Design a protein with these regions (language model features):
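Positively charged n-region of N-terminal signal peptides that target proteins for export
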Residues: 1-4
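Bacterial N-terminal signal peptides
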Residues: 7-17
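Extracellular/lumen-exposed scaffold segments
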Residues: 22-287
Length: 287
């Protein structure tokens, strides 16, 4: 499947007044095709005036198998979530730990996870004094020598009490790229920053140039997404920066893969920069 055939994430939250049981630590595993998935529960959290419950989807893979990030690159299928049937749920936000780039076996490159992964969820209950029942139909793909689709149907009752999987969820959340501003230096302790984004013409091709600042000698990768899921931008490739400042990395990619009728002018790109010690996310406008 090419990047132009990528399906978007579907997140559907349903609400119910039906009372649910007390919280659990994890659902049963649902597995097939060299992979299995389950829901896990953590403790309650709060951001500003919003109270939420920590949960996650844990995916276990056989050795040598892999699965995909929200944007899978040149080939692959991102996970999809259908939360229809959940009870006492106002909203659900899926978080994505930092992925890595790997060869897709067909001459292209994909983005995903080379091994087990936990995808954190933040669940906002309709009534925070009551448990919430989380139901999800998960669709995803797993790849070894061949790629196969996988599905799981999972349910778990969540409460505000910390469960046995709290530390696993916190560790997964720590790997989620943090949003920072374009051009920021050492914001909130981050070692990475996206310094500039601009377009340039190279012969008949228009391309995007991104400069990333990082500690000298530390490997860095960069991924680019468009404003909607039907954008299929190529993976940025590293190149030698015009500025020889220590730690400055330059990435380029052709301005290709736009959906029919879409215009690059003014489009907001989401850029994810990753190193062994940091992961950040930056929004940048193409002017």
């Amino acid at each position: 499947m090419t990047r132009r055939m990528i399906i978007s994430i579907v997140v559907v939250a349903c609400f119910s007044r039906v009372p649910v049981a007390r919280g659990q630590d994890a659902s049963a595993w649902d597995g097939q095709f060299h992979a299995a998935a389950r829901l896990i529960a953590g403790a309650a959290g709060q951001t500003a005036d919003t109270k939420w419950l920590r949960a996650g989807i844990e995916i276990r893979l056989d050795p040598g198998w892999k699965t995909y990030w929200r944007y899978p690159g040149d080939s692959g299928v991102p996970p999809t979530f259908d939360f229809a049937g959940s009870e006492n749920v106002q909203s659900i936000t899926a978080l994505w730990p930092a992925p890595e780039r790997f060869a897709d076996g067909a001459g292209g490159q994909s983005i995903g996870y080379l091994g087990d992964v936990v995808l954190p969820l933040r669940v906002v209950p309709k009534d925070a004094s009551m448990p919430s029942l989380l139901r999800v139909k998960l669709g995803y793909a797993v790849c070894g020598n061949l790629c196969v689709p996988a599905q799981a149907q999972l349910d778990l009752t969540l409460s505000a009490k910390a469960g046995a999987e709290e530390s696993m969820l916190v560790a997964a959340e720590d790997r989620v790229p943090r949003p920072i501003q374009l051009g920021s230096h050492d914001q909130a302790g981050h070692r990475l920053s996206v310094q500039s984004v601009h377009r340039e013409i190279d012969g008949a091709h228009e391309r995007v140039v991104v400069e990333v600042a990082a500690p000298e000698g530390e490997p860095v990768d960069l991924f680019a997404e468009g404003p909607t899921a039907d954008w299929a931008l190529p993976l940025p490739e590293p190149t030698k920066p015009a500025n020889s400042a220590p730690g400055l990395r330059r990435f380029i990619f052709d301005l290709d893969g736009l959906p029919p009728g879409a215009k690059a002018d003014g489009a907001m790109l989401r850029l994810t920069a990753i190193s062994p010690t940091d992961a950040i996310e930056v929004e940048a406008r193409l002017d």
